[in-house]
Structure formats: C-alpha cells, structure tokens
UniProtKB/Swiss-Prot annotation:
Classification via SUPFAM superfamilies: a domain/subunit of cytochrome bc1 complex (Ubiquinol-cytochrome c reductase), Transmembrane di-heme cytochromes
Name of this protein: Cytochrome b
The organism's taxonomic lineage, starting at the top: Eukaryota, Metazoa, Chordata, Craniata, Vertebrata
Residues the record lists as binding heme b b562: H83, H182
PROSITE patterns registered for this protein in UniProt: CYTB_CTER, CYTB_NTER
Function: Component of the ubiquinol-cytochrome c reductase complex (complex III or cytochrome b-c1 complex) that is part of the mitochondrial respiratory chain. The b-c1 complex mediates electron transfer from ubiquinol to cytochrome c. Contributes to the generation of a proton gradient across the mitochondrial membrane that is then used for ATP synthesis.
Gene behind the chain: Mt-Cyb
Cofactor(s) required, per the database record: heme b
Record-listed heme b b566 binding positions: H97, H196
Compartment list: Mitochondrion inner membrane
GO cellular component, one term: respiratory chain complex III
Subunit structure: The cytochrome bc1 complex contains 11 subunits: 3 respiratory subunits (MT-CYB, CYC1 and UQCRFS1), 2 core proteins (UQCRC1 and UQCRC2) and 6 low-molecular weight proteins (UQCRH/QCR6, UQCRB/QCR7, UQCRQ/QCR8, UQCR10/QCR9, UQCR11/QCR10 and a cleavage product of UQCRFS1). This cytochrome bc1 complex then forms a dimer.
C-alpha cells in the first residue's frame, strides 16, 4: 500500500510543498527568510485575533481599550507587544528576503517576483493601518499626513482623500474602516503567499551560484525542515528579547498620548520600517513628485528583471556589482536615519543626495556594471 501522504488529495499538496520537494543542496541561510515570513504572518494573525477580541474601533474608546488590554487582560501586554514588535520582525525578514532576491538574481522568476512585490505593498498597507488603530498622537497624525498625500493626485485628489476619510478629517469613520481593512488584509496576504509559493514550485528554488541545480537536488525534509526550525528559534529568541526587555524600543513615545487633533507633534514620522520611503518622499519639494518617488521607491523592484544586463544571474562572481549592491544597502540605512530626523540643514541635503543615489544605483550604475563585467569576462564578442 502506498504512503497516504503521497495519495491523499490534501496531504499530497503538503507533501509536494514541504516534504518531498526537491531543493538545491547548496542554499544558504539567506533562503530561511521565506519560512520565517510565514511564521511571522501566523504569529501576527494569532496575536491580532486575540487583540481584536478586546479592541474597540471607536475614537472615544480605542486608546483606552489598548490600555485595558495591557493592564487588565491576562497576558494582554504580552500579546500586544508581540504583535507590535512582531511587525518589526516581519519587516526585518521582508527586507532581508528582498535583499537576498536582489543579490542572487531571484527576480528572474518573474511571476514569483511580481507577486512578492504585490505582497510587499500589501504588508506595508496593513502595517500602516495597524499603526493607526491605538489612536495615539502619532497614529492620528501619521494617518492624517499619509492619507493627505493622495490629495496630490490631479483633479480627483481632494475628493479621493475625503472618500477614504469618510468625512472632512481623520475621524471615527476612518478608524472603523482601517480596523476592518487591517483585519482582512492578512488573510489576503496569506492567500497571496500561497500563490507566491505555487509559482516558486513551478520553477524550483534559485541558489547562491545562480546556476541550474537540477543535477544536485535533495529532499526538503529533513534537511531544510530542521534548518528552518533553527531559523525560527533564533527569530523567536530575538523577538522575545525585544518583547520582554525592550518592548518600546522601536515605538514612538508620542503614541502613549491620546490622539488630539488640536495639537500637532513636533516631528511626525512613521514606524522605522517606512523611514527610508518617508525620507525619499520628503526629499522632493513638490507634493506630487514626492508621492510618485515614494511609490516608485518600492515599485522599482518590479523593474529589476528588465534592468538585468549581465549574462550571470547571481552577484556571487560579480565584484563590481557587489560593491554597488552594498553601497545601496548603506544608502538605504542612511535614508532610514534621515527619515527620522527633523527637516533642517544638513538633513535635507543628505536626504536628497541619498534619494538620488538610491535611484541612480538601481537604474543606471548596476545595469552598466553588468555590461562591464561581461566585457571583462569576454562573454561579449
């Protein structure tokens, strides 16, 4: 009798995805982040579900309901801080996952990559709306500033903003709809993640060399299941260290003040994971130009397959592009730092230079270096 996991309609899918899946024998720890993102999503959905049992999406009671969760609900403080810091872990894993894809040329799997970009937008939207829910000062003003950006769209902008707000300012209607969207989006993300995996399993995983690994495949279980479990344990160690020892390290103190439409905080800024994009937005004096640059800073990822000029897929054997890649990483760290600084000299000019170099490296320098490296290897006639 054949094994049930190979014949049962449901178990068969799980078997082909996580047990008997042929995987390259040389994928490094950089390939752990896909599974870590899956775990992050599950943690966020579970903690979020328990938070939603006690949260009220009303401007009068939202702030006090979060206080109630932390003070009166059994382990409510733990659930709340796991959810808040879990979002940070989610984005750390996301950035490393995307960075891995850029370094090793995984963007040549077009369908997988494009769904990944869509997932990134969905996660960013979810995180933004989640940040509004506690209804603190930074929640309210963050929502006001970011939604207001849509007013830069010609002709329909103002109408669109008021339609999203559900009134003439960020108010009760806005909070209620943000809660509804914040609740539903993670399930859409989970569905998209399954499609992401579906497309990945059509081609098989990439590997550090960027070469075809069909000749040397190993079963996913036990080799990569045990490797993923180790990654998950390390991630939980970091997450729980944050939650139990430094729960507010990545948050903003202003969010411990209830939202007050009459009092603007001195420095309005989003959570740390949006700061790089926020810095790009602020570095352009024109409102519409800033919004376009903000969207393009993420959407540029979708252009990566078309900007690939080298005959080699991975950066493993491409030292010039490697240097440019690490300059890009440093550049993103500078943008993240600038996004959290006030709009004054010298931060303005640093932000503008970092924004220009961000787009220049991706759109101009990396494609040129790919051609130069091929010429050096005499791959061109």
């Amino acid at each position: 009798m054949t094994n049930m996991r190979k014949t049962h309609p449901l178990f068969k899918i799980i078997n082909h995805s996580f047990i008997d899946l042929p995987a390259p024998s040389n994928i490094s720890s950089w390939w752990n982040f896909g599974s870590l993102l899956g775990v992050c999503l599950m943690v966020q959905i579970i903690t979020g579900l328990f938070l939603a049992m006690h949260y009220t999406s009303d401007t009068m009671t939202a702030f006090s309901s979060v206080t109630h969760i932390c003070r009166d609900v059994n382990y409510g403080w733990l659930i709340r801080y796991m959810h808040a810091n879990g979002a940070s872990m989610f984005f750390i894993c996301l950035f490393l996952h995307v960075g891995r894809g850029l370094y090793y040329g995984s963007y040549t799997f077009m369908e997988t990559w494009n769904i990944g970009v869509l997932l990134l937008f969905a996660v960013m939207a979810t995180a933004f709306m989640g940040y509004v829910l506690p209804w603190g000062q930074m929640s309210f003003w963050g929502a006001t500033v970011i939604t207001n950006l849509l007013s830069a769209i010609p002709y329909i902008g103002t109408t669109l903003v008021e339609w999203i707000w559900g009134g003439f300012s960020v108010d009760k209607a806005t909070l209620t709809r943000f809660f509804a969207f914040h609740f539903i989006l993670p399930f859409i993300i989970a569905a998209l993640a399954i499609v992401h995996l579906l497309f990945l399993h059509e081609t098989g995983s990439n590997n550090p060399t960027g070469l075809n690994s069909d000749a040397d495949k190993i079963p996913f279980h036990p080799y990569y299941t045990i490797k993923d479990i180790l990654g998950i344990l390390i991630m939980f160690l970091i997450l729980m260290t944050l939650v139990l020892f430094f729960p507010d390290m990545l948050g903003d103190p202003d969010n411990y003040m209830p939202a007050n439409p009459l009092n603007t905080p001195p420095h309005i800024k989003p959570e740390w994971y949006f700061l790089f994009a926020y810095a790009i937005l602020r570095s352009i004096p024109n409102k519409l130009g800033g919004v376009l640059a903000l969207i393009l800073s993420i959407l540029i990822l979708a252009l990566m397959p078309f900007l690939h000029t080298s005959k080699q897929r991975s950066l493993m054997f491409r030292p010039i592009t490697q240097i440019l890649y690490w300059i890009l990483v440093a550049n993103l760290l500078i943008l993240t730092w600038i996004g959290g600084q006030p709009v004054e000299h010298p931060f303005i000019i640093i932000g503008q230079l970092a924004s220009i170099s961000y787009f220049s490296i991706i759109l101009i320098l990396m494609p040129i270096s790919g051609i130069i490296e091929d010429k050096m290897l005499k791959l061109y006639p």
